[in-house]
């Protein structure tokens, strides 16, 4: 597994999401949209199947490219057009919404675990605070729910909302 991840999934600064039916990489820096995805990078760190320096580099890329003041987005930039070999599944949701660049609480939990495994507790805590409901008591309109509720997701930075 480690050899396959290193030879097929490492894109230079992070791990790709996958390879389409036509052989195109999803989550590659060479793309205009969907350059980086959260899940393959946090799970590379959590699974400990990749070299630690690569896991650290991947998580540094997550922080640079996906981290926001409201949590970590699932992908960036969000998709606006069909990806050959994948179809329209990436376009089910609008830009910055849910799986198309939104911020999911459960995926943010994985980010915290990954940083903890890498020994970066301060960064893990920073991620936790970024989507902690009580943090938004003075700006409840951001989540539009009671201040004790963890929403499924928050609109991502590319959302028009």
Where are these regions (language model features)?
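Acidic, mature catalytic/reactive cores of soluble proteins
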Residues: 1-161
